[in-house]
Regions:
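Conserved phosphate- and dinucleotide-binding cores of soluble alpha/beta proteins
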Residues: 1-277
C-alpha cells in the first residue's frame, strides 16, 4: 500500500481495530489508444495552453489528451483521480505546477487506481498530495486554479447541450462522480475551460452519441446551462453563450457524417431551427 502525503492521515488513537492484509492491490492497466481516441485527444489538447491546470479521469479519453501534451510547459494538476497517463508527462518535465495559483508546485488529487508503477511513484512523493473529496471537488477550490481545464466524458449529448454521463436510458451505467463540480469550478476559474469529450458514435458506429433528445429516463449530469465545449473526433463545438439554434448547428457539425442529415431534420422537427420545411 503506497503511503500518500497530503491530508489523508488518521491518528492511530482514532482506530477501534487494525487488521493487516497482505493481498496485492487491485490494478488497472491502460489499453492501447484507438485512432478515434487519438483524433479527439488531439482536438482537446488544442484547447490546452502552457501553464494550464488539468482535471482528467481514467481511460482512453484522458490518455489520448495527455499523449498530445508533450510539448507543453508548466502544466498543473488538480484532479479527482490520479492515473498512469500523468507519469510520462511528469518524467518529461511537462507537469511542474510552477504556474498554479492554488497549491503551486503540487499535484492535488482525491484518489488513484492504476499500475504497480503508479503506486510506487506516489509512495512518499512530496509533489503529490491527496485530500478528501469535499476539498478536492469543491468548485470554489477548483476555481482558485487559473486556466483550469476540466475534461470529462459523456454517453450522450442532445442538440441543446444536455449531457448524460451516468445512465443508458433509465439504467444506471456509472456514478456521476465529480463532473459537475469540475465543470462549474473550471467555468469560474480565470481563463478556465470546461470540456465534454466523447466519441461521436457507439456500438461500432451504428448509434450516434449526439442525439435529438436524450433517451427516455436518461439522467442529465451536466446541464445545458453548464456546458461549454463538446469535442468528438470530428471537431470542437463551443456552446456556452449560444442560442439553441446555434448550439444545434454546432453539434450537428461534430456528429458522425452518416447521422448529420437525420439530426438536422430532428432539429427542425423540434423547432430548434424554426418550422420544418
Amino acid at each position: 500500500m503506497p503511503r500518500t502525503l497530503g491530508n489523508g492521515f488518521i491518528h492511530v488513537s482514532k482506530l477501534d481495530a487494525c487488521i493487516e492484509v497482505d493481498r496485492p492491490l487491485d490494478t488497472y492497466s491502460p489499453g492501447s489508444l484507438t485512432d478515434i481516441e487519438k483524433t479527439f485527444g488531439k482536438h482537446v489538447a488544442g484547447l490546452i495552453d502552457d501553464g494550464a491546470c488539468l482535471q482528467l479521469g481514467i481511460g482512453g479519453i484522458p490518455d489520448a489528451v495527455l499523449d498530445f501534451l508533450h510539448d507543453r510547459k508548466d502544466i498543473g494538476i488538480h484532479t479527482e483521480m490520479f492515473s498512469d497517463g500523468l507519469l510520462e508527462l511528469m518524467d518529461r518535465g511537462v507537469v511542474t505546477g510552477d504556474r498554479k495559483t492554488f497549491h503551486p508546485g503540487k499535484i492535488i488529487a482525491g484518489f488513484t487506481i492504476g499500475s504497480e508503477k503508479l503506486y510506487d511513484y506516489i509512495h512518499d512523493n512530496a509533489l503529490i498530495e491527496f485530500h478528501p473529496s469535499d476539498y478536492v471537488n469543491d468548485p470554489f477550490n477548483i476555481a482558485r486554479n487559473d486556466n483550469m481545464v476540466a475534461i470529462n466524458s459523456a454517453l450522450q449529448v442532445d442538440l441543446t447541450g444536455q449531457v448524460c454521463a451516468d445512465s443508458i436510458g433509465a439504467y444506471i451505467y456509472s456514478g456521476f462522480g465529480g463532473q459537475v463540480d469540475f465543470m462549474r469550478g473550471a467555468a469560474m476559474s480565470k481563463g478556465g475551460i470546461p470540456v465534454t469529450a466523447m466519441p461521436a458514435t457507439a456500438v461500432g458506429g451504428e448509434v450516434s452519441r449526439i442525439v435529438p433528445m436524450l433517451n427516455e429516463g436518461a439522467g442529465v449530469v451536466t446541464s445545458r446551462a453548464d456546458v461549454h465545449y463538446v469535442v468528438t473526433e470530428y471537431g470542437v463545438a463551443q456552446l456556452h453563450g449560444k442560442c439553441v439554434r446555434d448550439r444545434a448547428k454546432a453539434l450537428v457539425e461534430i456528429a458522425a457524417p452518416q447521422f448529420q442529415e437525420s439530426l438536422l431534420r430532428a432539429a427542425h422537427k423540434r423547432r430548434l431551427f424554426g418550422p420544418l420545411i
